[in-house]
Amino acid sequence: GDMFFSKMQTVTVSVNCVGVMGKGLASRAKYQFPDVYVRYQDVCRSKRLRMGVPYLYKRESSLEHELADEPSSLPNANLATWFLLFPTKQHWREASVIRGIEEGLQWVRDNYVKEGISSLAMPALGCGLGRLEWRDIGPLMCHYLSALNIPTSIYLPAEQKVPEELLTKESLLGSGS
């Protein structure tokens, strides 16, 4: 599915820490939601966004409202969509870093209630352009996201087919779950 059309309150965009949204979901966010890009550049310049410390942008309008052909026909069109800018790499030229992703997931686990996140959509962090493998990232993401007491969705990379055996409960959460 298309994460930007999810019904989740908070949508995650994987980013670097230097303020460049050149490819992938980040590039799409940059062009579809210019305010997100402006905020992203600001938090990069001010060093508020760094590996292990995502930045939550609490926008005041919904994605549904902005993407719909007939916004006035939408129920609940006044609900805001927030963006979680989640660093997966320091510089856009580099590969994503598993340790930084894990630290960011720990931040989400430790701060989602305080920040008011009520539901969360995430891409497969670092997979695709970040050059990490779902077999490594999937279980890590599921470990942390399963600890959240809110609805969560993970959107798999469109560029590569994830083998079915890597999508089982045993593969993602271990056999003791």
Please place each PLM-identified region on the residue numbering.
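Macrodomain-like recognition of ADP-ribose-binding/processing modules
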Residues: 1-177
